[in-house]
Design a protein with these regions (language model features):
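Hydrophobic alpha-helical membrane context
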Residues: 15-16, 43, 115, 228
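Catalytic-core regions of hydrolytic enzymes
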Residues: 21-153, 168-172, 176-180, 236, ...
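Intrinsically disordered, low-complexity segments enriched in small/polar residues
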Residues: 153-159
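Active-site-adjacent mobile loop/cap segments within catalytic or ligand-binding domains
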Residues: 40, 159-261
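Long, low-complexity, intrinsically disordered segments
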Residues: 294-326
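Positively charged n-region of N-terminal signal peptides that target proteins for export
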Residues: 1-5
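Bacterial N-terminal signal peptides
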Residues: 6-16
């Protein structure tokens, strides 16, 4: 009897777990970098924190509209400060499937660069990669007691980054694939210079327990790049590219998808509006033709009547002239 009860309970547990897994929504965490008193990099006309938030929210809109089955979580949706560790904790508590952090690059005064690049967690292969990681990680110095929180990690010391050389794990391969998808789609779709996919020691990525990547949208310290990153149309192009890179990744790895997701509808010009405008234009043309057709007919009739009247007058005049000539 005890064996039967145990078997029944085991089967019930399996059914519950299966149902839970089947009903579980794919969870994406979008992380707009910086915020609040942490402005991030500064440009001549804007702050990094605002650019990051603008692109992140637009990217999220594409996901929410085209993938309603995806649960989208933002680490922030307003101008507030969120510690790096808490950003990762938000993703870990939600048992997220993917973590994408959105940032904007910068260079010291006098240097110019352009382009879009994507990072995954790992040991930097070049000094430029280390510089980017150091700049992004320096935000922890704004957190109270950060030495204890991050176990003595010093974002300004290159020695602290040696630990990233030994970080591997099951998430590495998928993170790199996600980064490559996003890099390819944004650079081709938004016509951005391709600065490639790199690895570097980002604390926010180290603390997450799922595949993740960090995006650098462009260089806020380069004048034309900053203008581009503040242009609503270009922001939409970039957000759409990020979405399409994410969709390509999900089509491959989310086994619950029966029909692959296609490219997103354009945010700025909805498809329904295009169809509606076309129909309206056709109706207007038909109405115009209907109005102008009678006028052309009347004019033709008037012209014919005038010609006939002129012919009759000429005939009468000829008849009157004949006796005089005789």
């Amino acid at each position: 009897m005890l064996k039967k009860i145990t078997l029944i309970l085991t089967l019930l547990c399996m059914l519950v777990l299966t149902a839970t897994g089947a009903n579980r929504r794919f969870t994406l965490v979008i992380d707009p970098g910086h915020g609040g008193h942490d402005a991030g990099a500064l440009g001549a006309i804007s702050k990094e924190k605002n650019i990051n938030l603008s692109v992140a929210l637009q990217f999220g809109k594409y996901v929410e509209r085209n993938m309603p089955d995806v649960r989208v979580i933002y680490t922030r949706k307003t101008d507030v400060f969120i510690p790096l560790k808490e950003r990762a904790n938000i993703a870990n508590r939600a048992n997220a499937d993917l973590f994408i952090s959105v940032h904007t690059n910068a260079l010291p005064a006098g240097k110019i660069a352009r382009g879009f690049e994507t990072y995954t967690l790992g040991m930097h292969r070049a000094k430029d990669n280390l510089d980017v990681a150091m700049r992004e990680n320096s935000v922890i110095s704004m957190e109270k007691g950060y030495q204890q929180t991050y176990q003595g990690f010093d974002p300004r010391s290159s020695e602290s980054y040696i630990i990233f050389e030994f970080i591997q794990g099951k998430n590495m391969e998928r993170s790199v694939e996600l980064a490559r998808n996003i890099q390819r789609k944004v650079c081709s779709g938004a016509n951005r210079p391709d600065k490639g996919v790199h690895q570097a020691g980002f604390l926010v990525l180290r603390e997450t327990s799922m595949p993740s990547c960090l995006i650098e949208l462009g260089f806020i310290t380069t004048a034309d790049e900053e203008r581009l990153l503040n242009d609503a149309s270009r922001v939409d192009d970039i957000a759409r590219g990020i979405y399409e890179g994410f969709a390509q990744y999900r089509n491959k790895y989310d086994k619950s998808i029966s029909v692959p997701y296609r490219a997103a509808d354009t945010e700025s010009v909805p498809v329904a509006k295009i169809v509606s405008d076309t129909k309206q234009e056709k109706d207007e043309r038909r109405a115009e033709e209907a109005d102008t057709a009678p006028r052309r007919t009347v004019k033709q009739v008037e012209t014919r009547a005038t010609k006939a009247k002129t012919v009759q007058q000429n005939r009468r005049q000829n008849q009157q002239d004949k006796p005089a000539q005789q």
